[in-house]
């Protein structure tokens, strides 16, 4: 790479202040470029340019977001002369008659993130130390991370430092590790740009720089792709099959403080669909953590190879050669299925720890941190209770918005209820299929009465007794337990 970011703290602070004054935010980008504008590619730049107004904010987006050269006087008018000088001092731009950004400065919420060029623009030319910005996996990692005041946080494979900065808002101290020196340079610059002084960057592979240390929050969006290559620091882990992800999970367990949480984006392999989650369940077993396995994409050999080499789709011959190399690699390993997803960990004392698996849609996941905390807290309480019927004496309330749906079948003439769904409308947006008759019990969970009393009242209202009342109680307990384990309900 022909340029290198420079963590000049004074210059970065000056630039950050100027960007805040002009209100360069994610919302502003969407307002000016449209809903799809935030994910713009290099090919879309000509259209984006023509959408921008002739204003100070428009000039800033043209230079920093679209990465187009602008007259130095125009950018000085928009941001101030000191900000233009800061762009040069931090290595972010070449300044002459025009200001030309070497990379991009992208607003992520109210943060500013510097990184390399447009992602995937010409991946074949990307150097091994290429540093990406706020990718879809970065967004997912953020959405799945429990937040709150903590002493220490750790971000593994920090890249441009997005997760480290998000943790730095509430952690007294954040350690960011990466094997790529250039990534740490970006992280240091981004920390300065956003005014963070509590992020420490350490060079090294994964957990090696923090040997013997523990943390309250651990995040990892390190290169988890199952790949026969070792080309890019941001994609290829360099170990066989899913060993890179296995190492991350097992080391995270060792480095979590008591009551700490880890959010790890990983991938795992399987020989067939019937055994698709065996690997992550094995990784998480035996440690002092409860785990939540969240598969997102489960792909066969060919689809996996295509997904991670889509940058070659305009070059049929090399594209085919790469696909053959990837599928042959997986075939030699006996791998039929590659799954990408997340593993969430919560460390707690006790002799019994549990895992569960739920498939999620990453397009629907949004700020699930509170849901995740409630879920792990509820699971710990359920372990303490012991017998399933002990839950009857507990008071439980819904923890957020849920939608109760009934399924009707009208094909036989008169509509007949055939199913029901409790849809969680926040966080991971998971749903629980159930029986129509249990929806009224869900609606009555306000924490004022015990679960046993709520179920007994429902049985009386329906005139149920004996085996029918026992069946209602059993089914209701199963449903309430499921809602607790998903973080859709809480103990009152």
Regions found by a protein language model. Give the residues of each.
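Mobile active-site "lid"/loop adjacent to the S-adenosyl-L-methionine
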Residues: 181, 222-247
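Acidic, low-complexity/disordered tracts enriched in E/D and polar residues
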Residues: 1-59, 102, 120-122, 350-443, ...
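Conserved Class I SAM-dependent methyltransferase catalytic core
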Residues: 180, 241-295
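Long, charge-rich, low-complexity alpha-helical segments
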Residues: 56-103, 142-146, 154, 159, ...
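Flexible, glycine-/basic-rich loop-and-beta segments that form/coincide
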Residues: 301-379
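Conserved SAM/SAH cofactor-binding pocket of Class I
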Residues: 135-220, 226
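SAM-dependent Rossmann-like transferase core, predominantly class I methyltransferases
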Residues: 94-153, 158-166
């Amino acid at each position: 790479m022909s340029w290198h970011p420079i963590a000049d703290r004074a210059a970065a602070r000056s630039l950050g202040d100027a960007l805040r004054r002009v209100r360069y935010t994610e919302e502003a980008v969407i307002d000016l470029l449209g809903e799809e504008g935030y994910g713009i590619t290099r090919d879309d730049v000509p259209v984006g340019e023509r959408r921008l107004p002739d204003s100070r904010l428009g000039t800033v987006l043209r230079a920093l977001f679209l990465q187009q050269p602008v007259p130095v006087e125009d950018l000085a008018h928009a941001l101030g002369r000191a900000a233009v000088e800061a762009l040069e001092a931090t290595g972010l731009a070449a300044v002459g008659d025009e200001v030309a950004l070497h990379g991009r400065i992208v607003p992520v919420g109210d943060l500013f993130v510097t990184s390399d060029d447009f992602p995937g623009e010409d991946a074949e030319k990307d150097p091994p130390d290429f540093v990406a910005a706020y990718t879809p996996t970065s967004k997912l990692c953020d959405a799945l991370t429990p937040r709150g005041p903590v002493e220490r946080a750790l971000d593994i494979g920090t890249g441009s430092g997005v997760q480290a900065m998000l943790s730095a808002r509430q952690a007294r101290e954040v350690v960011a590790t990466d094997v790529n020196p250039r990534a740490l340079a970006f992280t240091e610059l981004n920390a300065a740009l956003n005014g963070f002084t509590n992020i420490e960057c350490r060079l090294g592979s994964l957990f090696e720089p923090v040997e013997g240390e523990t943390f309250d929050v651990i995040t990892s969006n390190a290169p988890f792709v199952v790949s026969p290559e070792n080309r890019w620091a941001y994609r290829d882990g360099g170990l066989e099959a899913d060993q890179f992800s296995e190492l991350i999970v097992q080391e995270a367990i060792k480095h979590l403080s008591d009551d700490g949480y880890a959010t790890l984006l990983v991938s795992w392999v399987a020989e067939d669909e019937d055994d698709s989650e065996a690997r992550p369940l094995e990784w998480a077993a035996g440690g002092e953590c409860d785990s939540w396995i969240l598969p997102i994409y489960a792909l066969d050999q060919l689809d996996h190879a295509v997904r991670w080499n889509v940058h070659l789709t305009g070059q049929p011959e090399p594209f085919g050669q790469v696909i053959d190399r990837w599928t042959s690699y997986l075939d030699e390993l006996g791998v039929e299925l590659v799954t990408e997803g997340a593993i969430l960990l919560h460390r707690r004392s006790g002799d019994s720890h549990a895992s569960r698996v739920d498939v999620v849609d990453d397009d629907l996941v949004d700020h699930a941190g509170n849901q995740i905390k409630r879920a792990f807290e509820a699971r710990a309480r359920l372990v303490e209770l012991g017998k399933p019927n002990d839950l009857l004496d507990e008071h439980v309330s819904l923890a957020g918005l849920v939608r109760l749906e009934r399924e009707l079948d009208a094909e036989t003439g008169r509509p007949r209820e055939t199913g029901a769904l409790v849809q969680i409308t926040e966080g991971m947006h998971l749903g629980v299929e159930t029986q129509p008759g249990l929806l009224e019990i869900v609606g009555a969970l306000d924490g004022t009465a015990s679960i046993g009393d709520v179920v007994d009242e429902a049985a009386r209202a329906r005139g149920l007794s004996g085996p029918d009342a026992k069946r209602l109680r059993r089914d209701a307990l199963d449903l309430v337990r499921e809602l607790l384990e998903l973080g859709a309900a809480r103990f009152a």
